[in-house]
């Protein structure tokens, strides 16, 4: 991660100047052409600075969380903090729905102060587009996919079962009702991730929750699918909802615009000979396109090594509280990454993602006379 951040910051200042005018970009920030939404020649912009600062901030977040989690008490505190974040995220979503239904949405105006137009009072198929504490429905959905990955995995492992299970269930309901294409596409992906994790948990440790989920989940999905298919009215509603939120999305003005961003981002990658045009220079609508267009092949390799070293490389004691939390952090990061691949305009993945990475990377130091396994924050009865 350190190498990725250093490379990103250096290239953010170097590449837009060295490659100036060699390709057309959709500026992420303000350039010498002002605030524009269409293609302009490659030039440095304000977001080269702001995105570099965000990258440095993400690195500091990762290091601070990893350092705090190196102690058993700190590790447990970070886990509780993650659950608190999940709780507040869901509470804000419920408040968003409640204030909209009662005509008191202005009460949330103190945190909806962005300069651009916010679509936080629109409906799709009769459902309010949920934004919670975020600026857009898609951003809310992306964060909630991460919350689902973390809380559902802890529930499968039996840690804080009532709290984590309730949060996971609430996340699923809110994602379905959010009307976000990110949520509708991301939910099946997370279902597969969580099902594979349940099988892994069931074979590694004694967990009745994981065993029951592994047996019941496929049956539930089959019964639900048959119920929808056999009821013409219900299947019509579901089909209409999917058409509106997913299948017809690319034909909307927003879908066409976002597709053009990705097309131009890929062109930036090719015309820069695989180097990219610098972090914060151009706008995309997919994390992969943003990564390629910003930091090129070298950045892609560094990011892949970061993911492997943090989320995939074995560390610590197997079948322990820490290993369960690492799996939860990995699944949460998978949820966030799914959302990023569908909508991210830049390579900044935010503090939530890098806090999860810090938690996954930490191996708490055992005291000389301590027990070999952490007791964790408590199992559900």
Stretches found by the model and what they are:
Residues 1-32, 308, 319-324, 362-381:
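Transmembrane signal-anchor hairpin modules in multi-pass inner-membrane enzymes, especially those
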Residues 52-64, 77-110, 117-197, 313:
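Alpha-helical transmembrane segments of multi-pass inner-membrane proteins
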Residues 11, 240-291, 295-302:
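TM-adjacent membrane-interface loops and short helices in multi-pass inner/ER membrane proteins
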Residues 73-82, 159-165, 203-219:
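Membrane-interfacial entry segments at the cytosolic side of transmembrane helices
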């Amino acid at each position: 991660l350190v190498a990725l951040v250093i490379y990103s910051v250096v290239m953010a200042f170097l590449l837009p100047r060295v490659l100036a005018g060699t390709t057309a970009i959709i500026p992420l920030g303000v350039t010498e052409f002002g605030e524009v939404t269409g293609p302009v020649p490659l030039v440095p912009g304000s977001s080269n600075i702001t995105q570099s600062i965000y990258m440095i901030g993400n690195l500091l977040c990762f290091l601070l969380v990893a350092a705090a989690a190196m102690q058993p008490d700190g590790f447990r505190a970070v886990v509780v903090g993650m659950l608190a974040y999940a709780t507040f995220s869901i509470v804000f979503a419920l408040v968003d729905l409640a204030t909209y239904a009662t005509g008191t949405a202005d009460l949330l105006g103190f945190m909806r102060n962005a300069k651009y137009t916010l679509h936080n009072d629109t409906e799709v198929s009769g459902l309010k587009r949920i934004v919670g504490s975020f600026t857009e429905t898609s951003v809310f959905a992306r964060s909630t996919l991460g919350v689902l990955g973390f809380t559902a995995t802890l529930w499968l492992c039996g840690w804080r079962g009532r709290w984590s299970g309730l949060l996971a269930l609430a996340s699923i309901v809110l994602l379905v009702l959010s009307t976000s294409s990110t949520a509708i596409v991301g939910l099946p992906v997370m279902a597969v991730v969580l099902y594979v994790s349940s099988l892994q948990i069931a074979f590694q440790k004694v967990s009745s929750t994981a065993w029951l989920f592994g047996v019941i989940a496929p049956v539930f999905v089959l019964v639900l699918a048959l119920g929808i298919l056999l009821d013409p009215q219900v299947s019509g509603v579901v089909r209409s909802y999917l058409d509106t939120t997913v299948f017809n999305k690319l034909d909307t003005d927003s879908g066409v615009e976002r597709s053009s961003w990705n097309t131009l981002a890929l062109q930036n990658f090719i015309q820069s000979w695989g180097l990219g045009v610098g972090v914060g220079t151009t706008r995309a609508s997919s994390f992969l396109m943003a990564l390629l267009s910003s930091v090129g092949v070298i950045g892609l390799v560094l990011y892949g090594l970061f993911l492997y070293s943090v989320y995939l490389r074995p560390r610590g004691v197997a079948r322990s509280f820490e290993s369960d939390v690492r799996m939860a952090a990995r699944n949460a990061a998978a949820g966030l990454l799914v959302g990023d691949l569908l909508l991210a305009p830049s390579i900044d993945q935010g503090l939530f993602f890098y806090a999860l990475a810090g938690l996954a990377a930490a191996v708490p130091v055992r005291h000389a006379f301590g027990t070999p396994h952490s007791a964790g924050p408590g199992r559900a009865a």
